[in-house]
Amino acid sequence: MNTSKPLNGRVLISDGLGRDSFNTQLLYFTCSSLSADDERIYLISDRDGHPNVWMHDMFRGTDRKLTDNQKGILKSYVYFDGTQDEGLGKASVCLDYIRERIYYIQDDKICRSDRDGNIRVLNRVPDGRMTAFAHVSLDGTKLCVPMTDGRILDFDPDTEGYGLDKRPKYNIDQRAQDEGLNSYLCVYDTESGALLYEKTIPRCWITHVQFHPLDSDIIMYNHEWSAFDCGIRRVNIYDHRQDIFYHVRTEGDDTKGNSRGYARSRNDWVCHEMWTDDGRSIIYHGGYDHGPAMVGRCDIDFTHTDADGLPVRNFWEIALPDEYNAYGHFLMDHRGNLTCDGYYRMPGEKIIERENSTDNGPDPHRKDGAYITKVEPDWDEGTLHWVPLCKHDSDWLGQDAHPHPIYAHAGDRIFFNSRMAHTVNVYAVSARTPQEVREV
């Protein structure tokens, strides 16, 4: 029996005239794509033949190109078949949504552009390094560009890659371990472009970084596609003030919420970490070892230390129903509500079987989620209230087709990517709970 619920309508945000001829996507979820007043949205589009960053004024219906890329896609994490040292680093683009400045890598240059398209070169990427998703501090003063020894992606995508994205056949993190490859947290002054410091993280492949929202001396970073111990190695903190780095998630059976009896284990899969606005908590999700998917919260108290001299941490995790096994991402609004592009299953609905050539990473879940949902957590009770808002119907084929939903700053809308046919486009849906339509 189909017991489908009412849904809201999705609205096309990207250019409707060219929706079938070019791709348009949000910036990566570790930063917002929206101005503080939610009037302008910053997008990556290849409408002129090459990926560039565009500002779309949603109230006036105008567009402005902010970058000047004419060399395709730079090779980096998730864009494995890009060109070495040439092109736009699609993974590098991040927005200072308060001052409306974008930061990005063009060829080997670290650049900044304002909303009027005034471009300034801040610095350069050192030779022999590979870059990934960058991040700007909330106060707008610092830019962190994660880099790794170039050997990490030293391969020919055409002969040594596989899948739609041509990722290498070798285990990337294992190469970092075996060959002693390092990552570097490179932090720059956003005005002068000066390198403020560079922290070496040994035997590590960093692809995601996020400044603490209230303390730019603290950076959260990841170990991407961990070859071992993903349950504890994935999420990490570097405290520049104390010059220490450490894993955030620990093993243990003291988890609050509702883990359905699963203890935290190094053999779990953990992913997509993000700060809450106050910097007191880190949200993440993943799956228990031979168990269900889960979403978690780590409260981290930087004012008190444990027996190891590290900040006191407490964990809440909520195990999902067994049938909620569709890969997705959890993002948060400014009020603590989550949104998700996967996991949820509409009761009674037949699951669409998808042939996902990118479904070959370390995660244990299927890439066949079809809904944008609003998820209201009660961490202490260990419950999640799922509200399906609309279908995104993306095919999940490649990073750019991952919906990666984000809230408007006002919390009233959710924006997401979707490829329903041949191209990726950006849509929005109301975050209000859908209402039944009653006949009178």
Residues covered by each model-derived region:
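A short helix->beta-strand "capping" segment at the edge of beta-propeller domains
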Residues: 2-27, 386-390
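Beta-strand-rich domains and repeat architectures in extracellular enzymes and scaffolds
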Residues: 15-53, 91, 209
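Residue position within the beta-strands of beta-propeller blades
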Residues: 40-44, 103-105, 142-146, 218-224, ...
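Short, conserved, GDST-rich strand-edge loop motifs in beta-rich repeat architectures
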Residues: 46, 87-89, 145-180, 221-233, ...
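Asp-box/WD-like beta-propeller blade repeats and closely related beta-sheet repeat scaffolds
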Residues: 70-184, 195-201
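Conserved blade-ending motifs and adjacent loop-strand segments that build the rim/top face
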Residues: 250-257, 313-331, 381-407
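Loop/turn-rich, solvent-exposed surfaces of beta-rich toroidal or solenoidal domains
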Residues: 276-295, 318-385
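Blade-level signature of beta-propeller repeat domains, shared across WD40, Kelch, NHL, RCC1
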Residues: 401-440
